[in-house]
Amino acid sequence: FFLGDGVDDFAQAENFIRRRDPDALMLDVRGNNDFCCPNAPYYRVTDFGGVRLYLTHGHLERVKLTRSFLYERAREEKCDIAFYGHTHEPDMVTGVPMLVNPGAVCREQMAMLEVEDGRPRVKMLVF
């Protein structure tokens, strides 16, 4: 998942991921600096292996001030995990919903979600 701010960064991450898993699900959302793609959504709710995900850049949920708006939005959408960006700092808060910021691809940081038997596992990666 690409969480906004930089189409070039998304291409770099996609190449890295495709080498590991050619069938990986790739989704993106628009960030506050993605002026080139006005049709891209600001958030998505999707199902991955029986796990419900909320994907957002995070600026509309004001994640630089607090994660509580993000937490409430993910709960409203009945999501198990909320992935967000905007701060460009890796972060993971366990619970339901789990909150995950993979960091910044330009700093060679990302998170990988694996689901087995409906149980999610998130790994923070540096490449």
List each model region and its residues.
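Short, surface-exposed charged micro-motifs
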Residues: V45, D91, M112
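Active-site-proximal segments of metal-dependent phosphoesterases and phosphodiesterases across multiple
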Residues: N39-E77, V105
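Binuclear metal-dependent phosphoesterase catalytic core
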Residues: G49, E72-E77, G95-F127
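Core catalytic region of metal-dependent phosphoesterases/phosphodiesterases
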Residues: F1-F48
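Active-site neighborhood of phospho(di)ester-bond hydrolases with catalytic His/Asp-centered motifs
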Residues: F1-D5, L27-N32, Y54-H57, D80-H86, ...
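Active-site environment of divalent metal-dependent phosphoester hydrolases
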Residues: V7-A11, N33-P38, E61-T66, I81-T94, ...
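A generic structural signal for ordered secondary structure
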Residues: L27, T94-G95
